[in-house]
From Swiss-Prot:
Protein family membership: Belongs to the class-I aminoacyl-tRNA synthetase family. MshC subfamily.
Motif 'HIGH' region positions after renumbering to this chain: 45-55
Cofactor binding mode and count: Binds 1 zinc ion per subunit.
Cofactor(s) in the UniProt record: Zn(2+)
Protein's recorded name: L-cysteine:1D-myo-inositol 2-amino-2-deoxy-alpha-D-glucopyranoside ligase
HAMAP family found in the cross-reference section: MshC
Subunit structure: Monomer.
Record motif 'KMSKS' region, residues: 291-295
Gene transcribed to yield this protein: mshC
Keywords for the protein's UniProt record, in alphabetical order: ATP-binding, Ligase, Metal-binding, Nucleotide-binding, Zinc
Residues involved in L-cysteinyl-5'-AMP binding: C43, G44, I45, T46, T58, N81, I82, T83, W229, G251, S252, D253, I285
Keyword Metal-binding set for record: yes
Natural source organism: Mycobacterium tuberculosis (strain ATCC 25618 / H37Rv)
Residues involved in Zn(2+) binding: C43, C233, H258
Length: 414
């Protein structure tokens, strides 16, 4: 599937330190050590509604990683999926009386516009689940063949769905570190079906949902139906990149069940101990002290902000003001502060000269390499900007160097 426009990324002189990121599986910050080509898989949207700031914060986070790898001289193979086979999409299409494919196409187009406006670098492979059915079927066949999957007995219900055995890998649970009770609760809350009759274990995850009347379905050797959520990402990642990813990423709400099962699906057929070397998760974004949710009706949409002539660079800078792993709140104050900061940065970098900037660029690189510490990086830049505006300087190349660093590393257009 076509992604979005890729803005040019300027090249800074020199190199920054090695990137270190918090790994959700190991529960610690440690170095990310990609090979000749870095690999990253980030879970994409379910295209049934417009992009809100929670989505934006996640993709801006992984855009920082993308930019830091480029700054380190790495090539990158970045894959992102589109979950265009999922119940929320079908339910929204039914509610609105539109074809689910048309709804998905419209929302994907809007998402791409939002990402381009926020200057998020696109993935090399942008893959809809509907484009990878054959890969999913092949992966399910392998899981059935090795005993990691089973078909629900016909005596237990009309539909012979296929499930993945949660105990198919000895290491199941390492990615989240959650206990069984927490896993069961989150399965119930996040699209699982622990109470489904006929399952070997309540935690077992759906791989193939046999066709039901009125639901979209695709042909397969085990009958018409559609894939489960987790196998979509496992199949797309394995077919586009292979096992042993440098990073699997997404929002913190994907730690379990989605990323745990995606990893287990891949590991049971690849034989790898870990699907990814790093599991990286971004925190959630709330609005004015409340969780942002459709039920509350308090979603802040990127497209709505753009329609109000809010500058996307200010939105991006506002999201970067907090640490990526922290759950945090968006507010008018956050936006106002980001807008004012953007104006100050533009004023300073437009000066004919300023204080020497080599040190501040080195500090920005160092802070970002330390688990994407954007608050410290922004504070360092604020310090240089204050000195430039209030005291001036004699380095004619400094303003341009700072502007280039802000563009290349933070993705903010001045």
């Amino acid at each position: 599937m076509q992604s979005w426009y890729c803005p040019p990324v300027p090249v800074l002189p020199g190199r920054g330190p090695q990137l270190r990121l918090y790994d959700s599986a190991d529960r610690q910050v440690r170095p990310v050590a990609p090979g000749s080509k870095a690999t990253m898989y980030v879970c994409g949207i379910t295209p049934y509604d417009a992009t809100h700031l929670g989505h934006a914060a996640t993709y801006v986070t992984f855009d920082l990683i993308h930019r830091l790898w480029l700054d380190l001289g790495h090539e990158l193979h970045y894959v992102q999926n589109i979950t265009d086979i999922d119940d929320p999409l079908f339910e929204r299409a039914d509610r609105d009386g539109v074809d689910w494919r048309d709804l998905a196409q419209a929302e994907v187009a809007l998402f791409c516009e939002d990402m381009a406006a926020l200057r998020v670098l696109p993935p090399q492979d942008y893959v809809g689940a509907t484009e990878a059915i054959a890969e999913m079927v092949e992966l399910i066949e392998k899981m059935l063949a090795c005993g990691a999957a089973y078909v629900i007995d016909r005596e237990m219900g009309e539909y012979q769905d296929i499930y993945f055995r949660a105990d198919a890998t000895l290491q199941f649970g390492y990615e989240s570190g959650y206990d069984r009770d927490t896993m069961l609760r989150l399965c119930e809350e996040r699209g699982g079906d622990p109470r489904r009759p006929g399952k070997s274990d309540e935690l077992d995850a759906l791989l193939w949902r046999a066709a039901r009347p009125g639901e979209p379905s695709w042909p397969s050797p085990f009958g018409p139906g559609r894939p489960g959520w987790h196998v979509e990402c496992a199949a797309i990642a394995l077919s586009r990149i292979g096992s042993g990813l440098d990073i699997q990423g997404g929002g913190s709400d994907l730690i379990f069940p989605h990323h745990e099962f995606t990893a287990a699906h891949a590991e049971c057929v690849s034989g790898e101990r870990r699907f990814a070397r790093h599991y990286v998760h971004a925190g959630m974004i709330g609005w004015d002290g409340h969780k942002m949710s459709k039920s509350r009706g308090n979603l802040v949409l990127v497209s709505a902000l753009r329609a109000q002539d809010v500058e996307p660079s200010a939105v991006r800078l506002g999201l970067l003001a907090g640490h990526y792993r922290a759950d945090r709140f968006w507010s008018q104050q956050v936006l106002d502060e980001a807008t004012a900061r953007l104006h100050r940065w533009r004023t300073a970098t437009a000066l004919p000269a300023g204080p020497a900037a080599v040190d501040v660029v080195a500090r920005v690189r160092r802070y970002l390499a330390d688990d994407l510490d954007t608050p410290k990086a922004i504070a360092a830049l604020d310090g240089w900007v204050t000195d430039a505006v209030e005291y001036g300087g004699h380095d004619a190349g400094a303003p341009k160097l700072v502007a280039t660093a802000i563009d290349a590393l933070l993705g903010v257009d001045l």
